[in-house]
UniProtKB/Swiss-Prot annotation:
Pfam families: AA_kinase (PF00696). One of its GO terms (molecular function) is UMP kinase activity. UMP binds at G51, D71, C132, G133, N134, P135, F136, F137, T138, T139. This is Uridylate kinase. Gene3D superfamilies: Acetylglutamate kinase-like. Pathway: Pyrimidine metabolism; CTP biosynthesis via de novo pathway; UDP from UMP (UMPK route): step 1/1. The keyword Lipoprotein does not apply. Belongs to the UMP kinase family. ATP binds at K9, L10, S11, G12, G52, R56, T159, Y165, D168. The lineage of its organism: Bacteria, Bacillati, Cyanobacteriota, Cyanophyceae, Synechococcales. GO terms for cellular component: cytoplasm. It catalyses: UMP + ATP = UDP + ADP. Its EC number is 2.7.4.22. It comes from Prochlorococcus marinus subsp. pastoris (strain CCMP1986 / NIES-2087 / MED4).
Length: 234
């Protein structure tokens, strides 16, 4: 089953590649080429991008910053990533619009739901930056919110691991990978795949979540085509 309208969540860390900080142009190009294949198959694609490769609000708060202030700095980091992603996508011929929850008229459109949906209908990729515009909400929650708003069929969380595990596979060799699990299981067992607000929002709106490895070339188009390449939460 090929999905028709997809919300792709890219973590900021995914854009780092093997770098300790910032954006790896090779990773952006690889993502852009994969997205180009998705768009060529007439799939409508919106992207929410994180900012953890540049600044993470929770860490800033832990280091002594006011939490709301730290979150706003994190939102600005997501806009930097969104513009970089737009550049990469347009280099491979994918028409792209950036919409931000905090107005920055010189560099991006403001987030307007109906306009975003119209862009999708015209075959453009829409990259959402600036989180949801409010502190105390993660970009995972933004992904769930935007998916509900644009009537996406699925949230695809592209990350550093190849699915959902019962514990950190980088720390525990015996970690068990789930091929599928329920929203309630994630919430009850406090499985660290997305924050509870994001999971609950997807649960309330019956939007499945697919978690897969972004670093394996071609995985975005495989996920959109419905291949079982990661873990499915529903």
């Amino acid at each position: 089953m090929t999905y028709k309208r997809v919300l792709l969540k890219l973590s900021g860390e995914a854009l780092m590649g093997d770098k300790p900080y910032g954006i790896d142009p090779a990773i952006v190009q690889s993502i852009a080429e994969d997205v180009e294949r998705v768009i060529a198959n007439k799939v409508q694609l919106a992207i929410v991008v994180g900012g953890g490769n540049i600044f993470r609000g929770l860490k800033g708060s832990a280091d002594g910053m006011d939490r709301a202030t730290a979150d706003y700095v994190g939102m600005l980091a997501t806009v930097m990533n969104a513009i970089s992603l737009q550049d990469g996508l347009e280099r491979v011929g994918v028409e792209t619009r950036v919409q931000t929850a905090i107005e920055m008229q010189e560099i991006a459109e403001p987030y307007i739901r109906r306009r975003a949906m119209r862009h999708l209908e015209k075959g453009r990729v829409v990259v959402f930056g600036g989180g949801c515009g409010n502190p105390f909400f993660t970009t995972d929650t933004t992904a769930a919110l935007r998916a509900a708003e644009i009537n996406a069929e699925v949230v695809m969380k592209a990350t550093k691991v190849d699915g959902v595990y019962d514990r950190d596979p980088n720390k525990f060799k015996e970690a068990k990978k789930y091929s599928s699990l329920t929203y309630q299981q994630v919430l009850s067992d406090e499985i660290a795949v997305m924050d509870s607000t994001a999971i609950a929002l997807c649960k309330d709106n019956n939007i499945p979540i697919m978690v897969f490895d972004i670093f394996k070339k071609g995985n975005i188009s495989r996920a959109v085509a419905g291949e079982s390449i990661g873990s499915l939460i529903s």
